């Protein structure tokens, strides 16, 4: 068995949430763990249970070097083989155990209680509802919905992480139980009576950003029965090795693949008409003669990119994010008196330009003008520049020497964002950019997909603009966040020219925001 070949990126994410982090100690702690996934035929034979197991393995195999895959009856043994293949497609050197004797923690799907002497989390779902219990099996529902099932896997993986690294987490007690509807984000002990098996026409929908959150959304949409319509998937990048840390649909075979092409492949079993656009959003908009965007799912990394999407004036936007302390989803019309997407990301004060931020993260802020020139010209970084970075970072030059002559953005993404300097410094040189854990990005993506489907189906929307979840703490009792419309008058949703343009595109009718109870 061995840690995955992208473990340094996973370690970068962990370093941002764990106290007293040391790379060597972190890897040693992982190598001691055996994480079990146990299941019976009740889970293995239904769509919800299969979805829970699939995503649980996709999440766990990205971090832990040994998994115990444990079918609890003969009828479920066929599923074990598929899960083993899935785990090895992510980390070919992962250790697979067929006994739970050495397991430190276990996720259990189905209706059976395994005879294991370790911390156990029973996970499952019932339609829109995600379920977790510390004491009793929760089973898997009979619907074809993936949302509760996928969210349960994220809650389970988060509790596994909090169990193993409890000593380095503050306030990270374990969840005693969870019963949360992704339809309303209400906690409920009763069966969620919302529609579960129904055809949904997405109309013409855009999914912008096919990174970690986008992968979570694609995973869910690919498992949603009865979807039709046209889905535009927009992202200009290709999958890199470091992306495997949290891209739930990506394995070793997908490295180098266009993210837009991967999205098309993931959705090929659906009835969706998928159009891949391997472009930046601005390039896609410029090439598109029609600037009507009925529904846009936003899974982008930066505030600037989100502002650009809102600037194109889509009719309705669902926006998903991960940040240092939580993840979430926000919902936006424009001419409705509520917060638009720009209201959520309105800059205050003077923001630093990209070249200044990169120069600072390279440890040489005084060279920001040289960094600016290198970015603009796409010129290769000279030898003396790489030497200066190595000196500033306190790491040897030799491992960075292969980057001499490469474009600065490539050097920055691989050496800094990709975790090479982090590894060379034994984790002492932390990456400033927030790198979420895989279970955080996946849940944000599942929530995004759920919002797109609910909106397309005409289901009533949430009474609040946003919903937030912190997976590094027990699930909170108040998840709804009534984000107010920007009151400064600076936002485009207060600009008469933008309002007039929106009304010319879509008429004077506005999107209703509420109906689902937030209580």
From Swiss-Prot:
Membrane topology: Multi-pass membrane protein
Key words of the record: Cell membrane, Membrane, Plasmid, Transmembrane, Transmembrane helix
Gene3D superfamilies, alphabetized: NAD(P)-binding Rossmann-like Domain (3.40.50.720)
Pfam families: Prok-E2_C (PF14459), ThiF (PF00899)
Record-annotated membrane-spanning stretches: 141-161, 202-222, 385-405, 433-453
Disulfide bond entries: none
UniProt organism field: Sinorhizobium fredii (strain NBRC 101917 / NGR234)
Coiled-coil zones: none
Domain of life: Bacteria
Record bears the keyword Transmembrane helix: yes
GO molecular function: ubiquitin-like modifier activating enzyme activity
Subcellular location: Cell membrane
Name of the featured protein: Uncharacterized protein y4jF
GO cellular component: plasma membrane
CDD domains tied to this protein: E1_enzyme_family
UniProt KW Ribonucleoprotein keyword: no
